[in-house]
Amino acid sequence: MIAARLNMRFPSERVKAVTLSYDDQSEQDITLIDILNKNGMKATFNISTGLYSYEGKQFKEGAVCRRVTRKRAIELYKDSGHEVAVHGFSHPYLTQMPSSSVAREVFADRLNLEADFETDVRGMAYPFGDYSYSEEVANALRATGIVYSRMTSATRKFRLPSDWLKWNPTCKHTDEKLMELAEKFVADATNKEPMLFYLWGHSFEFEADDNWEVIEKFCEYMGNREDIWYATNIEIYDYVQAYQRLIWTADMKRVYNPSAIPVSFQYHTIEDSGEIKQTYTVCSGETLVLTQRLNT
């Protein structure tokens, strides 16, 4: 018997992916989206629909967290190629509420987003980050159809989450090691496990700290690379789920893809002559028969 093992590959057989997540629907998202689009990158924008600004609102002098109106949000995010996700209708501390109220906060936000942006919304970022997480909160999210939710503790790693409702990012854009981590990510050539760089923050912080060059430098360095898949949070989630739904025969020589998207993987075999690797893509609805002896 030939021993075999698998490593997931992102679309177009890539090893690496990058995703971003920004909260609170502030006016500065307009500039951020321009920077992302210029560099071929994608982000998820986490919105509290109960906190839209009203039309004609005059902000106090010096205010930096200037939330957009509902109308402007639709103009900005709808059909932009970026994702909108839940952030709690009123941005509360979810751990300070009963489960029924957590569900109401999340479900109301989800309903509003789906109505305004005419898309399914299944993702979220915890308002106030880790302070809003508990097992009880996570159970309430599951009941409302949320499949992933981002936390705020930096891992400084490039791993996929083991628990999608406790999805911690690589780092925030304020991390002093941001570019060091970016360079490490780009330079890594091990080509083993899939690698994900996950950046998060609030775009109004760039104005508050007068440092738009931080995200510009990051995106210019990390963006527009052929070997990186740029995806929203939900695209990352959906792709991993599709990979995990692949159906294999017992001898691992035949695989069926029941999902709606193509899935890539690296197939390793250990034979007398040594380890042999081949990368495959199995299309939606396709059954792929793998050759017994693979080309290197």
PLM regions: where:
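Well-ordered, non-membrane alpha-helical segments in soluble/globular domains
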Residues: 66-71, 106, 178-184, 212-218
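Intrinsically disordered, low-complexity Pro/Gly/Ser/Thr-rich segments with frequent PxxP/GP/PP motifs
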Residues: 276-296
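A Trp-anchored, charged/polar loop motif used as the substrate-binding/catalytic surface
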Residues: 26, 172-189
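Metal-dependent polysaccharide deacetylase catalytic core of the NodB/CE4 family, i.e.
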Residues: 37-137, 143-147, 152-171, 195-203
